[in-house]
Curated annotation (Swiss-Prot):
ATP 1 binds at S49, G50, T51, G52, K53, T54, L55, S90, K225, L226, R227, T229, H231. This is Circadian clock oscillator protein KaiC. Phosphorylated on serine/threonine residues by autocatalysis. Both phosphorylated and unphosphorylated forms exist. Both autophosphorylates and autodephosphorylates. Phosphorylated form correlates with clock speed. Phosphorylated on serine and threonine residues by autocatalysis. Has a 4 step phosphorylation cycle; the autokinase acts first on Thr-432, then Ser-431. When Ser-431 is modified KaiC switches to an autophosphatase mode, acting first on phospho-Thr-432 then phospho-Ser-431. PANTHER family: CIRCADIAN CLOCK OSCILLATOR PROTEIN KAIC 1, PTHR42926. The gene is kaiC. Residues 248-260 are annotated as: Linker. Changing D123A: Very little KaiB binding, decreased binding of SasA. Binds 2 Mg(2+) ions per subunit, one in each domain. Mg(2+) is required for hexamerization and phosphatase activity. Residues 116-123 are annotated as: B-loop, required to bind KaiB and SasA.
Length: 518
């Protein structure tokens, strides 16, 4: 009987016990798979061209070697070993070093470049023996085969090829190694694989997709099945930068602590309207038409944090660094000085420069590196351009969830299309994700255009219900009294209401008495 590593069990032992899993250490995958891939079994990784199948297979082996010291075998039917080694270097993975150490072996089964015809019946016996010999020689516990589709494309007898691939999968299972087989599919949402590959590798199936949504491509991963064990259902977005990074939004737990500590918005009157300021770990959304003063509120919020010795991080998707600094300077805020002191970091990028998942990865990386107490995004609506509502909502959940996990106060802006009035807070229904909503809008009073601000929502706290006048001066934001004697301001049709003069005079007199008593 083949000697197996101590941490593995034989196939017969596995069948009578709970299915064990080995972690892949691919970021996010072990969360959605509830621990990794079933040990000693073959997993089919299927996807169209360019979805990241080969990368998944290489990363599975690389992490096994570098993290768990588990040797691996990579069988290639498509690319040459030299190309695989070269491509891996772009992710910082030195496969040649692992090969030299005897921890990785790349078995070259790629087609003959001279294109010689194969005579006789198709038979993988020699290849199976080579793989088996390599597994025993290197004491490998992980095997990646990329890709079985290439075998079908080289030979016409699909039924014979299926039989031989089944023999290979069965032999690998006998050896107790955990295997990944990659295969091509024609459509993103069509059959699992070409040539009926899923028929013989049906225990575990993972599907990678690269779908065009709107104007951008979006990568997702779905675990179709892991036989005999649990996993999370549905598609989860991922990016490719330093390897595959999956965002397991459904695995996020609402277990973060809630703070009663208040932080200042930078505008005294707004703090009073919010019952003493924002909660430390809350998410604030300022929403309104363009020019209503959302960026000003963000700037004051960040400046106040920096003045208290806190670090602040601003992600700007509509204005350049120079423009932000110039505008802030007109309000008496020196962003450049705050950056020189290391208290503020500004990241500017066009929304179209990357996909939503890439932006999310950048945001998380910058937060992890800079460790700010306050984070602002100006604006979310810019990132929503050209993507589906579902993808955008998942992005916002990812950002807010990470901010709460790190106990960071987040301040986001959203630009509405409607110039006057408001039918909804946001078009993408993200208002339920936030803790505090500041509604900013234009109102026409006596033939003049004014701005209005209202604390529309604030979880866990009393807040002012009034609709107040919001003025932008050279000193910044100034919030004045409510629009008295007017109704219909939020709907965009303010109407003056009649006032009982006697009652109004009594109210004014009482106000004067209160001031004198103070």
């Amino acid at each position: 009987m083949t000697n197996l590593p101590e941490h593995q069990s034989s196939p017969t032992e596995q069948s009578s016990a709970e299915v064990k899993k080995i972690p892949t250490m691919i970021e996010g995958f072990d969360d959605i798979s509830h621990g990794g891939l079933p040990q000693g079994r073959t997993t089919l990784v299927s996807g169209t061209s360019g979805t990241g199948k080969t990368l998944f297979a290489v990363q599975f082996l690389y992490n096994g070697i570098t993290i768990f010291n588990e040797p691996g075998i990579f069988v290639t039917f498509e690319e040459s070993p030299q190309d695989i080694i070269k491509n891996a270097l772009s992710f910082g993975w030195n496969l040649q070093s692992l090969i030299d150490q005897g921890k990785l072996f790349i078995l070259d089964a790629s087609p003959d470049p001279d294109g010689q015809e194969v005579a006789g019946d198709f038979d993988l016996s020699a290849l199976i023996e080579r793989i088996q010999y390599a597994i025993r020689k290197y004491k490998a516990t992980r095997v990646s085969i990329d890709s079985v589709t290439a075998v079908f494309q080289q030979y016409d007898a699909a039924s014979v090829v299926r039989r031989e691939i089944f023999r290979l999968a069965f032999r690998l299972k006998q050896l107790g190694v955990t295997t990944i087989m990659t295969t091509e599919r024609v459509d993103e949402y069509g059959p699992v694989a070409r040539f009926g590959v899923e028929e013989f590798v049906s225990d575990n199936v993972v599907i990678l997709r690269n779908v065009l949504e709107g104007e951008r491509r979006r990568r997702t991963v779905e675990i179709l099945k892991l036989r005999g064990t649990t996993h999370m259902k549905g598609e989860y977005p991922f990016t490719i930068n330093n390897g595959i990074n999956i965002f397991p939004l459904g695995a996020m737990r609402l277990t973060q602590r809630s703070s009663n500590v208040r932080v200042s918005s930078g505008v005294k009157t707004l703090d009073e309207m919010c019952g003493g300021g924002f909660f430390k770990d809350s998410i604030i959304l300022a929403t309104g038409a363009t020019g209503t003063g959302k960026t000003l509120l963000v700037s004051k919020f960040l400046e106040t944090g920096c003045q208290q010795g806190e670090r602040a991080l601003l992600f700007a998707y509509e204005e350049s660094r120079a423009q932000l600094s110039r505008n802030a300077s007109s309000w008496g805020i020196d962003f450049e000085e705050l950056e020189r002191r290391g208290l503020l970091r500004i990241i500017c990028a066009y929304p179209e420069s990357a996909g939503l998942e890439d932006h999310l990865q950048i945001i998380k990386s910058e937060i992890a590196d800079f460790k700010p107490s306050r984070v602002a995004i100006d604006s979310l609506s810019a990132l929503a351009r050209g993507v589906s509502n579902n993808a955008f909502r998942q992005f916002v959940i990812g950002v807010t969830g990470f901010a709460k996990q790190e106990e960071i106060t987040g301040f986001f802006t959203n630009t509405t299309d409607q110039f006057m009035g408001s039918n909804s807070i946001t078009e993408s229904h993200i208002s339920t994700i936030t803790d505090t909503i500041l509604l900013l809008q234009y109102v026409e009073i006596r033939g003049e255009m004014s701005r209005a601000i209202n604390v529309f929502k604030m979880r866990g706290s009393w807040h002012d219900k009034g609709i107040r006048e919001y003025v932008i001066t050279e000193k910044g934001a100034e919030i004045r009294d409510s629009f008295r004697n007017f109704e219909g301001i939020i709907s965009g049709t303010p109407t003056r209401i009649s006032v009982d003069e006697k009652t109004e005079l009594a109210r004014i007199a009482k106000g004067m008495q209160d001031l004198e008593s103070e």
